């Protein structure tokens, strides 16, 4: 029987049921792991390494070859938990995606997610077959598994170097879109029997993507409409409802034989750009769930690895990773982005920024569950590849961005985090915001905000003291503002507040607008 065998006594040939004492021990271990993982984020942020490596290391240390000595080999459980975690991670990523930023990058990102994946799979699989001796089915699985990129890993090392919107938008949209076709390819290659003809496979991929996209957009729009028109009795219910709607999108897409991963990403993106009530609270809740999902998933994947078995697979992993990084990824980027006249500097950065993260290691469990011959070797190769090339690419990304002179827009003012609470019976909204340290709203008088008729600043909280402001009250950094707006002018009031936060009191004349909602 697979699973974690931690010296648990058995009764009548079966594992004994979980007791309260076992639960207490489990909660203690899980909470300690979470605390260690949270503390490790500080180390990873200073070193420039994506945090996924730290979490994987924690899992390996807890495993049978580490200090924990836990034997865990349940690939099916890992796959199920990994899928659930990936749904949460994609939902959090979609909620934080600004439509205005990725809209110009959609054609290029779509090309990378479809044509780019095909090129990457073909080149990498060919190299894996001829250079490492893998059978064609195994080589195709490896090529498909490692073709998925992880923008979260990229942004974790580039967060201190703001990039042009096109680069960030392309990387973010690509990572959200390419998971779906890659999952379909891995499942198809891992299925028993001959692989479908390429045109049949392409047709199935396009059909599943279309179903997933349609359901995701529909569920997201309906969910956003409902949350904007129904006043829930407690603010804490809004984040729960948003995440539940995102999971509904995934489940509906998967059960309809579409791409559930694309559905959850698009549904979350629709809701993330709909100016929902209590948005900062929702983003904070989703961000916390995303961290928990990442920590749990990577620790579990680390547990599944058996380090003493990796020795024979290190060289093949390095060879495949070298071809992927130096040939397949750059070729995909050049073929897909050159028609869109993307400058070579941006192409170079996006070629190097194809970091692999959670998805490849999760997808490597699919052939293990399917009983594909050599599946354990596939998992080991993918694991080594992800770890080694993340160690190489992660710390060098900021250096490359500076060398290519792409670290610009660093002095842009921070957006305001505006939280909106509906006042259903009064047919209005209460907007709450805090002026960030670098906001250009600092030094602006209340009357210089020029809010639309029907909106007014009713209260200012400064250093723990609240007062009703006068028209001549000067706003300062750290002030919390409460703004009451009627339903018809709520959106206009939010846009004006964001515009002043970005451009100061002359925002309207200088062309600064507030159309993009806060993340």
Each language-model region and where it sits:
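Soluble N-terminal domains of membrane-associated systems
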Residues: 483, 488-496, 505, 511-512, ...
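Transmembrane helical cores of multi-pass secondary ion antiporters/exchangers
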Residues: 2-412, 423-425
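Active-site proximal loops enriched in glycine and acidic residues that flank catalytic Cys/His/Asp
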Residues: 363-365, 389, 437, 461, ...
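Short, solvent-exposed amphipathic alpha-helical segments in soluble enzyme
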Residues: 340, 367-368, 405, 449-451, ...
């Amino acid at each position: 029987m697979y699973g974690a065998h931690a010296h648990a006594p058995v009764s009548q040939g079966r594992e004994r049921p979980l007791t309260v004492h076992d639960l207490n021990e489990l909660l203690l271990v899980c909470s300690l792991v979470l605390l260690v993982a949270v503390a490790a984020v500080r180390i990873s942020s200073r070193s420039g390494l994506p945090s996924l490596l730290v979490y994987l290391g924690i899992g390996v240390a807890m495993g049978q070859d580490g200090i924990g000595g836990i034997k865990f080999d349940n690939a099916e459980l890992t796959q199920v938990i990994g899928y659930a975690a990936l749904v949460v991670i994609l939902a959090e990523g979609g909620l934080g995606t600004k439509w205005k930023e990725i809209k110009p990058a959609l054609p290029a990102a779509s090309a990378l997610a479809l044509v780019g994946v095909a090129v990457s799979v073909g080149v990498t699989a060919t190299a894996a077959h001829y250079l490492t001796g893998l059978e064609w089915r195994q080589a195709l699985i490896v090529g498909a598994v490692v073709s998925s990129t992880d923008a979260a890993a990229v942004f974790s090392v580039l967060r201190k170097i703001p990039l042009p919107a096109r680069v960030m938008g392309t990387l973010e949209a690509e990572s959200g879109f390419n998971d779906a076709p890659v999952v379909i390819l891995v499942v198809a290659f891992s299925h028993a029997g001959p692989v479908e003809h390429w045109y049949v496979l392409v047709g199935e991929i396009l059909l599943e993507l279309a179903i997933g996209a349609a359901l995701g957009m529909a569920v997201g729009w309906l969910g956003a409409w409902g949350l904007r028109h129904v006043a829930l009795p407690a603010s804490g219910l809004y984040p729960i409802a948003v995440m539940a709607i995102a999971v509904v999108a995934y489940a509906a897409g998967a059960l309809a034989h579409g791409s559930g991963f694309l559905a959850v990403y698009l549904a979350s993106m629709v809701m993330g750009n709909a100016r929902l009530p209590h948005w900062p609270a929702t983003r904070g809740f989703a961000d916390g769930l995303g961290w928990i999902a990442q920590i749990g998933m990577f620790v579990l994947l680390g547990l599944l690895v058996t380090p003493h078995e990796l020795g024979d697979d290190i060289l093949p992993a390095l060879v495949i990773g070298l071809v992927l990084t130096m040939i397949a990824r750059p070729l995909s980027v050049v073929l897909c982005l050159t028609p869109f006249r993307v400058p070579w500097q941006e192409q170079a950065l996006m070629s190097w920024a194809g970091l692999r993260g959670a998805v490849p290691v999760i997808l490597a469990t699919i052939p293990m569950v399917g009983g594909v011959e050599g599946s354990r070797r596939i998992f080991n190769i993918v694991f080594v590849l992800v770890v080694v090339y993340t160690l190489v690419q992660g710390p060098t990304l900021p250096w490359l961005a500076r060398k290519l002179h792409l670290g610009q827009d660093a002095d842009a003012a921070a957006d305001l985090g505006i939280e909106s609470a509906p006042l259903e019976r009064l047919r209005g909204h209460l907007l709450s915001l805090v002026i960030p340290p670098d906001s250009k709203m600092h030094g602006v008088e209340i009357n210089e905000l020029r809010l639309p008729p029907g909106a007014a600043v009713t209260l200012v909280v400064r250093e723990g003291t609240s007062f009703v402001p006068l028209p001549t009250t000067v706003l300062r950094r750290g002030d919390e503002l409460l703004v009451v707006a009627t339903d018809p002018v709520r959106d206009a009031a939010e846009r004006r507040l964001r515009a002043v936060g970005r451009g100061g009191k002359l925002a309207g004349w200088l062309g600064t607008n507030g159309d993009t909602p806060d993340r």
